[in-house]
């Protein structure tokens, strides 16, 4: 190893790198930078140190790369609760319009929309209709000398939709009687619907402290198939089913029953055992969720269903200058003509468009309800006569129109599903620190030693550079003061046995 001569004493001293290697806590380098000539031992230590450093860099880069891949893991847990908030329950009759409530004015404006009349306001296929229904329709569709009146889609749906007061035969919540006043009217694509436990209008949310049947909502409904519209054509409003559509959801999200609801058939008692799930997703770059606090144009709380309805509303308003009755906002409601000619085709086009137009990301916090359905036939042979007498209906009518819906928590617990970061900064630092200790015996303080050595080295170089500049300036000044004096340097031949700087000073004095 190179040794440098001491400027003051002329002796050999170790270089700065040798001093650092001898005092540093970095393993191995003291065996590389030692006093004396280059040996095989020093070469082997150098190879071992460089190899260990290379392995450290490879492993550390792999850990850094894994960190920036932003992986996540999912944690599932089940939590027992003392009580649970009962979910909102939205139900809709699959028939959106009661035939008996249709008026001549309704048929004049909306007969084509309902597929009851053609473009000429004529019954298209009278041979497909029941004679009694056909006669009633002909009377309602007699437009001879008729003067049409003003028409409102909101008023039409509210008046013609099924009334829960007429549909409901009985209602119980946790064994206590409830009624139509405990339901809130909402409008969906099915028309006039009803929501239980909405929490709106200042009503407190209902809770339950037990699981199992009898501790939730039990309701008996008459779907009134006699009121279903006759079908001899197909439109977006046409339905071939009989029953109700039901959606179980949280109070913070609007119903999207046409896509997320399940059907309940007449002639059966349907049991719905549900379990609450609380999901937590990660935002970018670990996930794709959107904060629930980031509201939308028409909804204060973000959810996927709210985003879908919000997007559809904006699209219809932009293209048709109106909105459907179930859509929020202050734009005017679409007329039946706008419904048929613009709004319904626009929704069809929107469904066919690239999904990026209505890109609805998952909210970061979401509550949903798992469901398990089972059903039994009603009425039984032994109860048929009793129900006939109680509701003054025939057994056939009961089998075709009456259903019972029983919704309850399977158990008084909820499931949490949470996304967590698979690799955080603390884990990254721990892995890199462990590998530093394994491969080169270094720690954070060792890194500080390296920075301190680099700082001292730079400072020394700068001071040497500044010292040389000052020395050159001083030498030039002394030479200028001696220009007028004779040069005696040639006459001096003796040797001065003093340090180099002292000797130079003496020579300059003699020279001057």
From Swiss-Prot:
Phenotypic consequence of residue 487 to S: No effect on N-glycosylation
What effect is documented for mutating residue 430 to K/T? Constitutive activation causing cell death
Tell me which GO cellular component terms the UniProt record holds: dendritic spine; membrane; neuron projection; neuronal cell body; plasma membrane; postsynaptic density membrane; synapse
Phosphoserine PTM sites in chain numbering:
8, 11
The impact of changing residue 127 to A is: No effect on pH dependence and function
Q: List the disulfide bonds.
A: 92-193, 289-364, 307-360, 311-358, 320-342, 322-334
List the subcellular locations.
Cell membrane
The biological process GO terms on file are: cellular response to acidic pH; cellular response to xenobiotic stimulus; detection of mechanical stimulus involved in sensory perception; establishment of localization in cell; monoatomic cation transport; monoatomic ion transmembrane transport; negative regulation of apoptotic process; phototransduction
Which UniProt keywords are present, listed alphabetically?
A: Cell membrane, Disulfide bond, Glycoprotein, Ion channel, Ion transport, Membrane, Phosphoprotein, Sodium, Sodium channel, Sodium transport, Transmembrane, Transmembrane helix, Transport
Q: Which residues are glycosylated?
A: 365, 392
Q: Where is this motif: GAS motif?
A: 441-443
What is the protein's membrane topology class? Multi-pass membrane protein
Changing residue 4 to N has the effect of: No effect on N-glycosylation
Superkingdom, according to UniProt? Eukaryota
* Phenotype upon changing residue 249 to A: No effect on pH dependence and function
Q: Which residues lie on this side of the membrane: Cytoplasmic?
A: 1-37, 449-512
Name the family.
Answer: Belongs to the amiloride-sensitive sodium channel (TC 1.A.6) family. ASIC2 subfamily.
Its job: Forms pH-gated trimeric sodium channels that act as postsynaptic excitatory sensors in the nervous system. Upon extracellular acidification, these channels generate rapid, transient inward currents that fully desensitize. Highly selective for sodium, they are permeable to other cations. By forming heterotrimeric channels with ASIC1, could contribute to synaptic plasticity, learning, and memory. Additionally, as acid sensors at nerve terminals, plays a role in mechanosensation and phototransduction.
What is this protein's record name? Answer: Acid-sensing ion channel 2
